[in-house]
């Protein structure tokens, strides 16, 4: 009957979601009796609420796809509905030759980002609301009179400031109680500095500027660090000086330091321990870098302020960098993705490892399909090895994270989402990677 196909797809998809299973539906077709009804040969393959393949009705098509059993197992482990039952079945040994077949299903290279514009905009608005509501509650609970946030002109601090502004609007508080601090250092470029200043002024926050150069040079002198040696001490000394400044301003103004670091940075440990790693409430802690871009873009598209939109678009166009090393010819010399790898790859690895529990070999296979034509296989494997090495080695930073709102199904909070020992060994994962 007319309209039955839509209902059938919803029914099959819904049932596969309810049971966390694969569902294969095969309808009768050409050749069946048409005395009272006509069969449409509507064939459907669904997995956990998602229609993988469906046949065109009345075409007698054969459809095929792959059902990811490991994914279904991972989903069922997360649900208390499905108990572990070790009895009640019989094992029957048999021989089966296992061959690797070509995967035909779509592998999303951006698992954190909805594909359709409508879904993406709805998700962005929801995430901004979750972040803002989380901060609103924390400000109310602590009776803080201000929020203190370091603004670098980069993506993460920009998003954190936008969230803070939304939280203040919910509270009916003056934006001047947002102490937005720019702290120029040895690696600050004119582009990021100008964007930071413009952003703060567009949002009517209280602009503050505290240069860290003199304080860091004095600190280097005190500890015997040669400022011409651009090592980890040179970089981390700047990050910790900035955090000290923000903490002290917060104490002085009865405020709270708002953390800016995102989920991708936390996964890689790309943060200075007790530097930008530390805050009083970390609003971006469960937002991956690939999603941060879309959140800032969504704000730019919907803010209704041309000047603010222009600033946000230039922030989006700026290379991701901690700006801890001196610039070259006035431009950013230290680009994060050149050092640790593309964030779109790392977010893909992170999602499939934490959300679905996949092993390195499977993640590598899926990544080769998802990023075919974008990255060479050798590049994908190189950064996958980097991801595992850093993820395990940097757990000690995640073991003492500040509070922050969870916005999605993947998070690394040590208080519930990732109860992982800081001295966990990566050996088993590296051995599998070395065999690829």
Predicted regions and their residues:
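Charged helix-capping and loop-helix junction motifs
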Residues: 6-13
